[in-house]
Design a protein with these regions (language model features):
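Long amphipathic alpha-helical scaffold regions
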Residues: 118-157, 218-243
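A structural micro-motif recognizing beta-strand termini
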Residues: 17-26, 66-72
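Ser/Thr/Gly-rich low-complexity blocks that favor extended beta-strand/coil architectures
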Residues: 1-11, 19-59
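Short glycine/acidic-rich loop motifs that flank beta-strands on beta-rich extracellular proteins
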Residues: 1, 102-109, 124-131, 153, ...
C-alpha cells in the first residue's frame, strides 16, 4: 500500500504544506517531479481531482512542502489528503504458503493490477485484507483490478479477531461516510477458490463497484467452534454491480 498525507496549509495556489499522519511513514521521500497526485476528501475517501508535482521539499521528518505544476484544483483545501498515484505497483502473488501469520495473510491496497493465485492460506486473521484509509493508518490504495483465483483457504483463517478481520476475505476500507454512488474499490473477482470454513464469515465487502464471487467451493470444517460476531456468510455495505453465482 501507499501512504496518504494530510494537507495542513495552502501556502499559495501552487504550494501546499503537508504532513505524514502515521509515524511509521515519517522521513520518506513522498514523491518526485512529474509524479501524479490524487486529492482525496477524507470523509468519503473520494478522489476529487489529480495534479502533477513539480518539487518535494522536506521540512522535517513529518512535514514537507509540495510544489504543483499547475494551481491547486478548485475546492481542495486544508484537511484534504494526498496520494501518490505514480508509485502504485502491480503485484503477482502465486504459489505461496501463508502460515503462522498473526493478523493477516496479505494486505493488498494498490491501484495496480493484482493477481493472487494458487496460494495456500492458514493465517489466524483474515487471509486477504483489501483496505485503504485516510483517517487512522493513512494507508492509500483504492484497488482497480484484483483477481483472487484458485487459492486454498484453510480452517485456521480468521480463527482470531484482529483489526479489520471481518471475514476470510475482508474488503474493509475505513470510510466515515461511504457513498454508494462513488465506491472506493472496484473490479474485484474472487473465483475458483476452495474455502475450508469452521465459522460463518466468508466475504465482507465495503464500498466496491464491480465485485464477483463465483465458482468457489465452500467446505464446512469442524476443527474449531464458530465464534465470530458476524453470522452471515457474505456481508455487503455500499457496494454496487455485485455478482454471486455458481458457488457450492
Amino acid at each position: 500500500h501507499g501512504t496518504c498525507s494530510r494537507i495542513m496549509e495552502v501556502l499559495s495556489p501552487t504550494r501546499i504544506k503537508c504532513k505524514f499522519m502515521q509515524d511509521m511513514s515519517e522521513g520518506m521521500e513522498w514523491g518526485r517531479p512529474d509524479e501524479t497526485i490524487g486529492f482525496i476528501e477524507h470523509k468519503t475517501m473520494r478522489t476529487v481531482a489529480t495534479g502533477k508535482m513539480n518539487k518535494f521539499e522536506a521540512l522535517n521528518k513529518a512535514e514537507f512542502i509540495i510544489e504543483l505544476s499547475v494551481p491547486l484544483p478548485a475546492g481542495v483545501e486544508a484537511g484534504y489528503v494526498i496520494e501518490n498515484l505514480t508509485c502504485t505497483p502491480d503485484a503477482e502473488i502465486r504459489n505461496c504458503h501463508f502460515g503462522s501469520c498473526r493478523a493477516r495473510g496479505l494486505l493488498v491496497s494498490t491501484p495496480g493490477k493484482v493477481i493472487i493465485e494458487n496460494n495456500v492460506f492458514e493465517s489466524s486473521g483474515s487471509a486477504i485484507l483489501i483496505a485503504g484509509d485516510a483517517n487512522a493508518w493513512y494507508e492509500s490504495g483504492a484497488v482497480k483490478d484484483v483477481l483472487i483465483r484458485n487459492n486454498d483457504f484453510r480452517y485456521p483463517c480468521n480463527s482470531s479477531i484482529y483489526q479489520f478481520c471481518e471475514a476470510v476475505i475482508s474488503i474493509d476500507p475505513e470510510i466515515p461516510t461511504p457513498e454508494q454512488k462513488y465506491p472506493y474499490h472496484r473490479n474485484i473477482r474472487i473465483m475458483d477458490n476452495t474455502f475450508h470454513l469452521f465459522d460463518y464469515p466468508i466475504l465482507f465487502a465495503r464500498s466496491v463497484n464491480g465485485l464477483t464471487f463465483s465458482s468457489n467451493t465452500l467446505i464446512r470444517d469442524t476443527t474449531y467452534q464458530p465464534y465470530h460476531y458476524r453470522k452471515e456468510g457474505i456481508t455487503l455495505e455500499a457496494c454496487k454491480s455485485v455478482v454471486i453465482s455458481n458457488n457450492k
